[in-house]
Amino acid sequence: LTRSRGLGDVYKRQLNNYAKLVNNFATKLKCKIIFEPGRSIIGNTGLLVSKVQFIKKGLNKNFIILDAGMNDFMRPALYDAFHKIIPITKNSSKMKSAIEFVGPICESTCKFGVYKKYQKLIENDFVAITNVGAYGSSLSSNYNTRPLIAEILINKNKFKYIRKKQNLQKLINS
């Protein structure tokens, strides 16, 4: 018997209810259950911090163009996956129309999320795309000749580079 697909991300489930259901099932069948936790362990551990490069005004919504692209984080492009986007600096001003967060790659799938209401952003503001710990790095690529971004491990008040940002020479040599 396989449940398949792992447990999923923490933000989409109620673990206690799930555990009770599985325990009842296992007790009745007198079987051993083995879990492959999937992205439930690290899915919510990563953030992709991105800078607002430009705001393009549209008729029905504005486009917030970030410096991160689909090559840096592919899940929204591949699976239409939702990842909450939070501003690094909060303010009380609101955008006047809906917004869509997009990347700088000229592809229709280089987008991260649509919000009907969001705080006002300006160029050079920073936002964080949440829950990118699972598959964020492993799905990243040099698509469109874009260098791989830096990865930083933060533990309390200390940080360490896991991977430094790829420079152009390393990109060409690879």
Name the predicted role of every residue range.
Residues L1-Y11:
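Single conserved hydrophobic/aromatic residue that forms the stacking wall/gate
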Residues G8-D9, N24, K28, K32:
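Catalytic cores of soluble, metal-dependent hydrolases
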Residues K12-L15, R146-P147:
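C-terminal helical cap(s) of enzyme catalytic domains, especially alpha/beta-barrels
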Residues L15-A26:
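Glycine-rich and small/hydrophobic secondary-structure elements
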Residues L21, K30-S174:
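Charged (often Lys/Glu-rich) extended helix/loop segments that serve as interaction or gating elements
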